[in-house]
Curated annotation (Swiss-Prot):
The keyword Glycosyltransferase applies. Pfam families: UDPGT. It is an enzyme of class 2 (transferase). It comes from Fragaria ananassa. Belongs to the UDP-glycosyltransferase family. This is UDP-glycosyltransferase 71K3. InterPro entries: UDP-glycosyltransf_plant, UDP_glucos_trans, UDP_glycos_trans_CS. PROSITE patterns: UDPGT (PS00375). One of its GO terms (molecular function) is UDP-glucosyltransferase activity. Disruption phenotype: Loss of fruit pigmentation, and substantial decrease of the levels of various acylphloroglucinol glucosides and an anthocyanin.
Length: 478
């Protein structure tokens, strides 16, 4: 049999690229017939992923990365609707991706056969480009099966209403999600001006030859049962958790001295005594909210490690959060002195290293799917503080459907006027450290997630099925 080549086209963004590369790495380790070429679209936001991707490519002889030339960015006023800006930026890159794919295909030797293209789910607008090469398109979901079910359901819901949802609308009945979904926890993109761009993405999901999901069947059984009952759904391959357990992304953003300081501090804390607050690469707060978080932590009486990043100053063209240069300016008077025996505040944090540390006992999170999987993997219960994208839906399901998290907020949205008060924060932090029932359940599901990716586990079997289907779909027709 010829060598088989898969082309990956991740969406531009740290979480999307890292997940795609980690999935690619797992494919290469599983089957030596396969090689992978990644067509990488540059992120519109500043990133320090270069050293991470270079190291990963250098460690895998059958993995190569080709940079797609930067296209013109959408007008900056669209950045007020992040999903709209993100989707338009991807669509602007379609001609450049077509050219890169053309050049790559024409350069291939006869001994290597391109068997398919794995597109990030946000890159569905490129399916027609892949079709031009008579190649099958597979979608890679960096999120979960419940969210995939929502994407399948969204066009049907729109056909009934024809407009963005309102808070007063009835709950949505999504086939792959057990409880009815309140409109206030639907993805932010449905109400921030991105609705029709988002609808355009969701309406093309069924055109894919198959969909790879970063989850496992045991975590989302109901969603996978709903896919099996729907004859119009493409095959869905749960292959997760797909995680960067070496925290290579974080280390590319963090010097060794900073990391050592954090880990050394954790080493001095009792087991499961520290609550970790971290809100992802784009999570940030105003100074007013920072003060309330500080007071809430103090009221809780718990030890804490807080990754503190601020909203960019007004008038800034950047959407990227900034580290705080002077903590005393933004924290309540005397806070640092009063909590110096109990807390540590940092900028960027090595999240996986922290979650895997024996001292960590709770996680206040923005509920990005990668962060949820990392926390479950390491058996750390979560307090929900969603901010953007589909995080409100993730938080809702984590608390109401899975019973694996504790609610602080399910519908908080970044950029709003709401300030969560110290009392609410303090109670939530204390509850996650004291709730033994949720902690036990999270530790149990962590074991399940680990077994899923071991030889013979559900995700390992599903990965093998994906490989065989891809190869059979291509070589079986020759």
């Amino acid at each position: 049999m010829k060598k088989a080549e898969l082309v990956f086209i991740p969406a531009p963004g740290a979480g999307h690229l890292v997940s795609a590369l980690q999935f690619g790495k797992r494919l290469l380790q599983r089957d030596d017939r396969i090689s992978i070429t990644v067509l990488a679209i540059k992120s519109a936001a500043p990133s320090s992923l270069g050293s991470y991707t270079e190291a990963l490519v250098a460690s895998e002889s059958r993995l190569q990365l080709i940079d797609v030339p930067q296209a013109e960015l959408p007008p900056l006023e669209f950045a007020k609707s992040p999903a709209k800006f993100f989707i338009l930026n991807i669509e602007n890159h379609v001609p450049n991706v077509r050219e890169a794919l053309t050049n790559y295909v024409s350069s291939k030797q006869d001994s290597v056969s391109i068997v398919g293209v794995v597109l990030d789910f946000f890159c569905v607008s490129m399916i027609h480009v892949v079709n031009e090469f008579n190649l099958p398109s597979y979608l890679f979901m960096t999120s979960n099966a419940g969210y995939l079910s929502f994407e399948f359901h969204f066009p049907a819901q729109d056909s009934r209403t024809g407009r963005p949802p309102k808070d007063s609308d009835p709950d949505w009945l999504v086939p792959g999600i057990v409880p009815p979904v309140p409109t206030k926890v639907l993805p932010v993109s449905l109400t921030d001006g991105s609705y029709y761009n988002y609808l355009g993405v969701a309406s093309r999901f069924r055109e894919a030859k198959g969909i790879i999901a970063n989850t496992c069947v045991e975590l989302e059984t109901h969603a996978f049962n709903s896919f099996a009952e729907d004859q119009t759904t493409p095959p869905v391959y749960p292959v997760g958790p797909v995680l960067d357990l070496n925290d290579g992304q974080a280390r590319s953003n963090l010097n060794q001295a900073q990391r050592d300081k954090i880990i050394s501090w954790l080493d001095d804390q009792p087991e499961e005594s520290v609550v970790f607050l971290c809100f992802g690469s784009m999570g940030s707060f105003t100074e007013a909210q920072v003060k309330e978080i500080a007071l809430g932590l103090e009221q809780s009486g718990q030890r804490f490690l807080w990754s503190l990043r601020l909203t960019p100053p007004k008038g800034s063209k950047s959407l990227t959060p900034v580290d705080c240069s002077n903590l005393e300016e933004v924290l309540p008077d005397g806070f640092l002195e009063r909590t110096r025996e109990k807390g540590l505040i940092c900028g960027w944090a090595p999240q996986v290293d922290v979650l895997s540390h024996k001292a960590t006992g709770g996680f206040v999170s923005h509920c990005g799917w990668n962060s949820i999987l990392e926390s479950l993997w390491h058996g750390v219960p979560i307090v929900t503080w969603p901010m953007y994208a589909e995080q409100q839906l993730n938080a809702f399901r984590l608390v109401k459907e899975m019973g694996l998290g504790l609610e602080m907020r399910l519908d908080y949205k970044r950029g709003g006027d709401e300030v969560v008060k110290a009392d609410e924060i303090g109670k939530a932090v204390a509850s996650v450290m004291e709730n033994s029932e949720v902690r036990k359940k999270v530790k149990e599901i962590g074991v399940v997630c680990r077994k899923a990716v071991e030889d013979g586990g559900s995700s390992s079997v599903s990965l093998g099925r994906f490989i065989e289907d891809v190869l059979r779909n291509h070589f079986g027709s020759e």
